[in-house]
Amino acid sequence: STVEDLTRTTFWKTGAFSLENNYEYAGPGIELYCGTEWRLITLNFGRSFKDQQPVIKRIVERLPITLEINLISFFLAYFIGVPLGLLLAVKRNTVVDRIVTTGTFMLWSLPSFWVGMLLILFFCNKEFFYWFPASGIRSLQVDATWSFWEILTDHIHHMVLPVIASTYSSFAGISRFMRTSVLDNLQQDYVRTAEAKGLRSSVVLLRHVVRNSLIPIVTLMANLLPGMIAGSVFIETIFTIPGLGLLSFQSVIIRDYPMAMALFFIGGGLSLLGILIADILLKITDPRIDFSKTQT
């Protein structure tokens, strides 16, 4: 009817006007563009559609747990992957090399969400091994009467499976890159020259080959920072970890556009930061690189 159409039109106009004013979407195009750029620079992403809380506040609340998982996974991946790749290069074409190489290829190809579900199935199920909790970052029984060490132990107990699920693929990939890089360097002339001068093979390997082999490994770090959000989506969703990954998934599902856009913007910024850090580390590991000289 006419009354219903008028009511519906009035409702949508009122709602649109309210949204435009609350989220500063009203005005000429150039003002909208400049305002948006300024809000991005100042990290003012507006308020969440879900609870009207400032977006940056909710991101800061979720950031520590995502940082914790990713930093632990980062150090574990390099701590395991680099020595393992070096060992496989030294033991090339042996039974150990072939078995471990096959295993790392399999780990590298497994999707994280599938591995996460398998971990929950086998290690959080009374029918198999009920060793770890399936979700969360702490037990429901935690209260003020618990000591610091009890809370820390409980938290570590909850973090074991998420860290494993986010580390296995990284260390497998790093070990493969490290093995290839070491084998390439072992064929270089400087290795034969050093051995001809009487240096022991272990000295040549650890002092010269390893450092040069780390150069391509360093460039992989450019993908680690943006992976803090993208790579955490599956892990945090499967294990119900209240971090940025789960927040990203929930924001997309409920169409919380300010939150989703803020997380995508931060992900893009982390990509650029990762590339910058990789370039700096590349200069440290490769003394041949000199940014002060310009190519003519």
Predicted regions and their residues:
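Membrane-water interface segments at the C-terminal ends of transmembrane alpha-helices
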Residues: 1, 103-136, 158, 165-171
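An internal, D/E-rich "acidic patch" concept
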Residues: 1-82
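Compositionally biased, charge-rich terminal segments
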Residues: 6-7, 16-27, 131-149
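Residue-level signal for pocket-adjacent positions within structured domains
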Residues: 40, 44, 50, 127, ...
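Glycine-centered flexibility motif
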Residues: 43-46, 116-119, 135-139, 231
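Phosphate-coordinating loops and pocket residues in cytosolic domains that bind phosphorylated ligands
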Residues: 50, 101, 134, 206, ...
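Alpha-helical transmembrane segments of integral membrane proteins
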Residues: 63-68, 72-96, 112, 125, ...
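Hydrophobic, well-ordered secondary-structure segments
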Residues: 84, 96-104, 116
